[in-house]
Amino acid sequence: DGTAKVVEFAPKTTKRLRFEVTDGDGPTLGLSEIEVFPSPQDYPDYVSYVDPYIESARGRYFFFVTGSRPFGMFSAAPMTRNKNQYGGGYNYNSTEILGFPQVHCWMLSGITLMPATGDIDPTKGEQGWKSRFSHNEELVQPGYHRVFLNDYKLWVEQTCTDRVGFYRMKYTEDCLSNTLLNLGGFTGTSTMTDAEVRQTGPAELEGSVSTVGRLWGGPEEVKIYFVMHFDKPFDRLDSWDDSLTTKAVTGLKVNSQATPRNAGMTYYDAPTAGIQALHRLKKGEELQVKIAISYTNIENARHNLAHECAHWDFDAIRRDARR
């Protein structure tokens, strides 16, 4: 009579399944769903069931978020396509990484970190600092992501707490490590403007950035505050604002304008702007970075970092994120 029929079998361990249809008529046969699960005895770790790649081929900017915990405020992931709908954010079919935004939410995004090496012209934006990657050199798990950036010959690992992102980079060659922090321009679902960054220590930064351009709802402007710690002192900090670059700085303040590209579309244009943290590193050396965020003030971002991730034990945070 057309109503749904559910057939449940008693639990049984098997190596092969065969389905035979006895009451259908060739091409008119309809089958809505078959669910087959591994034996629970073989998978006591329920997190191992999770496949973060699901819906990463035609999803949205905020669908694939490996650097996040359930109900956590921090939500980082590599970005391969800088758009929202129809395969934006991390897309499994892509071959290039444009950066690692720290915020992936509905109509909220920003604070893009890009580990690189050598002399980078940041005024070219993400097309100037992007890197090729391969799934053969990638590991994706809930709360953890590892990927090799081919153009820079370095490994990037990321994990997180509820409000802090934790990165560990390993360099396979002697190099000038060039870690870019982009705080300007369109990213996924909103546009970053009016960035402000200050150096507060030999290996510390703090600042804020405004996000605008939300077509599908939300406040006119949302400000994100952040505190950023490196585990090695800076050799030098450089900055850029649109087409202007400056060497040996202690901060950056940008007054940028976001303009709608097309009326009625969730896309605003604004120049890129940010900071480059430079370190001279040897082959095999690691560089670690922590970024804490807050939507209220810098003091709370600093509190989040001290309360949730006061140490430099990356693997401990990774294990805790998997629980």
Give each language-model segment a name.
Residues 40-323:
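Accessory carbohydrate-recognition regions in carbohydrate-active enzymes
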Residues 1-43:
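Aromatic, loop-rich ligand-recognition surfaces of beta-strand-rich domains
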